[in-house]
């Protein structure tokens, strides 16, 4: 199955972007080539930009506190697996503690490091990080991979609490969904929300339907899923076929 997700609000959109960026950073940081570590570093800049646009730390703490308060009464329910519940609550409490220990905003790392600031200002220019532009960065790229990796990990460390908080919130949200099999008749599907509020829409497609691409949109009244296909030039074109898929609507 291939999964497509659509956020209903800006807060979840920001968390999904951070999740994707942290995954990308982890992948390229695990590689050894200097070019791959360059991608890891520019991804770190993107994370700082996304996380610094709002008071993300406060939002995550509030949401985690809300989830902890919602789960705590379940400890009195004998039908609940108490060991699993304690593990979830413990993870939430650990995430809250890590976020509370984080000092300053995400962008402070960049503001306090002139060397990183110089790379960031050149990285937004196409080809702006060549050796004649940033000789010190060029020299750093020739250091052993282990040294470069240690440096990037040091710069990433202040942001790890944001990653943990983001991971917990998104996992809890995805687990709080209602799913059902539906069919996009003539390549299009719409559903009234009947006043219900959701935060995330998921569309699961069978691997055999990989050629069909869902374009999703929603407002507080209705959601739409319209399928397209790419032609030889990869331009999207409408689909007239009936396409089955699994629709999941998630909300805390």
Curated annotation (Swiss-Prot):
Keyword vocabulary terms for this entry: Cell cycle, Cell division, Cytoplasm, Septation
GO BP, one annotated term: FtsZ-dependent cytokinesis
Keyword Cell cycle: yes
GO cellular component terms listed in the entry, alphabetical order: cell division site; cytoplasm
Protein task: Cell division factor that enhances FtsZ-ring assembly. Directly interacts with FtsZ and promotes bundling of FtsZ protofilaments, with a reduction in FtsZ GTPase activity.
Record HAMAP family: ZapD
Self-association and partners: Interacts with FtsZ.
Family: Belongs to the ZapD family.
Protein name, entry field: Cell division protein ZapD
Organism expressing this protein natively: Cupriavidus necator (strain ATCC 17699 / DSM 428 / KCTC 22496 / NCIMB 10442 / H16 / Stanier 337)
Gene behind this protein: zapD
